[in-house]
A protein has these predicted regions:
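Phosphate/NTP-binding elements of NTP-utilizing enzymes
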Residues: 1-203
């Protein structure tokens, strides 16, 4: 809710709670920030499943959000404060062509280019917030796909004011350590019942 924070970018592995964080922030914005919102996903099927299995249950489970939810149609939730929550996929540029949004929530953006086949869906979605350049909130959440050209990897390593990363406590010295590959040590590997030295690929 800090006025100076215009965006949050989350790059993480599988099964690390990214969707839960995204929906929690979306729910907060519905409650505290009147204005048009958009939730985006890579494909139409992913969007349909996310709406049925995550978004609508979230809106029903919370008494506050349930009271704010108005009429719901395909890919659109009308809120009782007069604003809207739109749902859009990277596969369908027509869904976002004429929509201006204040708060944007992007899910698995590294898959957008493959799903769309052409164009730059990530840039297209961000352009939808241009009219709210001083008040917008953009949350980009994705696991990295490919090499350093990954969209989310570039997002978290360029033009970022503050970077946060997980740290774990060393069982020997109890000092917190960043989980970078060069800090992970595998002493022995059990293979076919025998202890062996791990190869670089197995470390």
């Amino acid at each position: 809710g800090r006025p100076g924070v215009k965006g949050i970018r989350v790059c993480g592995a599988h099964q690390t709670g990214k969707p839960r964080a995204r929906y929690a922030c979306l729910g907060w914005c519905i409650d505290y920030r009147a204005g048009t919102k958009m939730l985006t996903m890579p494909g139409d099927e992913t969007l349909k499943r996310g709406e049925a299995e995550k978004l609508l249950p979230l809106l029903e489970a919370s008494p506050v959000l349930r009271n704010l939810k108005g009429r719901t149609t395909a890919r659109h939730v009308r809120l009782k404060d007069g604003s809207s929550l739109f749902l859009s996929s990277a596969q369908a540029p027509g869904q976002r062509a004429s929509i201006t949004v204040q708060d944007l929530f992007m899910d698995e953006e590294d898959l957008y280019q493959k799903a769309a086949g052409k164009g730059d869906p990530v840039t297209d979605f961000i352009e939808r917030t241009r009219s709210y350049s001083f008040t917008r909130k953009i949350m980009r959440v994705s696991k990295p796909v490919g090499d350093a050209r990954s969209s989310i990897w570039q997002a978290v390593t360029r033009d970022v004011d503050l970077t946060l990363a997980y740290r774990v406590v060393c069982p020997t010295c109890f000092a917190p350590q960043f989980m970078s590959p060069e800090r992970v040590v595998c002493q022995k590997l059990i293979k076919d019942g025998q202890e062996t030295e791990p190869s670089p690929a197995e470390i």
